[in-house]
């Protein structure tokens, strides 16, 4: 067991949509354990993940020992992915990218072959083989990714979740890092700034600046300082600073600049950004535009923006008061008219009565 505890293996919690109940699951609930079998061509034998030096066109089979200490068979589904960089500037080895980076020539999923699933019998262990077929052309730098090992969800598990009324489950997986290289040629990291666009993170307005690592090498200890102004002006509207980030080889991520609850306003803006990594500095100054349609759409769904629809209720209230006043005025006018007519009738009646009295006296 001591050997297993020394493994540098990433535990990844895969969460589905939550509606009713969030359950807490820890590593002890996993029904299997893993141990990479480190081969002779490991660049550093002290590392407990795969960090292999190979040659172009070479083929090699590596193995991971899967141990099942439970009294039931366990079905494990392996998956291989190239490393990517998430929105927080952290390298992910077990996540599936929405879209492969344009500079990534060799995807690990195309280079490494593994079975779709493997059965590990109860109280036993199985060695899972993975075959690596290196590209024919030699490349500088590294290929980096991860081998995700997750237990297959059975129909019984699904039924139990349904009976318990759960809409969420914490599904954990082991992710073993895999790094491949062919030579020791020095690679100088290079970053590029791509699209700048308004978007949202967790239902909050941000302006995303897409940063891309176009080299086959990690960018370590990355710090970013960004500020946004109106085009042609100096007043800083939004700003963001981050340190200690890392980018995977040939990957990109959207660096979010928060608006801190402010409304997006249509117009022309300027982004000024500086990135630093181990003594190397990049600086960009780019103009971009936010159109009215995008601003309105995002403002409606930003949970931090105060609802300014109160004026509608105020308008309705004022309208009702005006209607009430108009109705009161009409009714008052009618009443006054009736009173005036009644007064005139009464005066006319008095006059007639008075005339009759005069005639009677004359007689």
What are these regions (language model features)?
Residues 46, 57-63, 126-128, 140-146, ...:
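Short, solvent-exposed loop/turn segments enriched in Ser/Thr/Gly
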Residues 74, 143, 147, 267-275:
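A short tyrosine-centered beta-strand micro-motif
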Residues 76-87, 92-101, 149-150, 216-232:
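Short acidic, flexible loop segments centered on an aromatic residue
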Residues 184-315:
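Membrane-proximal extracellular "stem/stalk" segments
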């Amino acid at each position: 067991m001591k050997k297993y505890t020394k493994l540098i293996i990433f535990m990844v919690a895969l969460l589905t949509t939550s509606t009713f109940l969030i359950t807490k699951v820890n590593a002890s609930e996993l029904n299997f354990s893993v141990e990479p079998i480190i081969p002779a061509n490991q660049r550093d034998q002290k590392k407990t993940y795969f960090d292999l030096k190979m040659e172009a066109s070479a083929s090699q089979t590596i193995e991971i020992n899967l141990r099942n200490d439970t009294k039931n068979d366990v079905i494990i589904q392996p998956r291989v992915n190239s490393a990517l960089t998430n929105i927080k500037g952290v390298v992910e080895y077990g996540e599936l990218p929405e879209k492969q980076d344009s500079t990534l020539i060799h995807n690990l999923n195309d280079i490494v072959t593994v079975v779709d699933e493997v059965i590990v019998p109860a109280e036993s262990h199985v060695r899972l083989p993975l075959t690596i077929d290196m590209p024919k052309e030699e490349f500088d730098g590294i290929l980096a990714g991860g081998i995700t090992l997750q237990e297959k969800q059975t129909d019984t598990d699904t039924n139990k979740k349904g009976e318990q009324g759960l809409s969420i489950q914490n599904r954990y997986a082991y992710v073993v890092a895999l790094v491949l290289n062919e030579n020791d040629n020095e690679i100088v990291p290079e970053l590029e700034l791509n699209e700048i666009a308004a978007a949202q993170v967790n239902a909050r307005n941000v302006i995303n600046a897409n940063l891309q690592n176009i080299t086959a090498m990690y960018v370590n200890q990355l710090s970013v300082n960004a500020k946004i102004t109106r085009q042609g002006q100096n007043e800083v509207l939004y700003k963001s600073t981050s340190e200690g980030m890392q980018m995977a080889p040939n990957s990109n991520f959207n660096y979010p600049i928060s608006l801190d609850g402010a409304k997006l306003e249509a117009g022309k803006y300027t982004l000024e950004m500086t990135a630093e990594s181990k003594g190397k500095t990049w600086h960009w100054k780019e103009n971009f535009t936010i159109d009215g349609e995008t601003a309105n759409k995002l403002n409606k769904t930003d949970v931090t923006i105060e609802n300014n629809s109160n004026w509608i209720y105020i308008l309705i209230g004022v309208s009702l008061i005006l209607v009430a006043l108009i109705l009161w005025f009409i009714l008052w006018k009618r009443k006054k008219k009736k009173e005036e007519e009644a007064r005139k009738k009464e005066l006319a009646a008095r006059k007639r009565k008075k005339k009759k009295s005069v005639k009677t006296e004359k007689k």
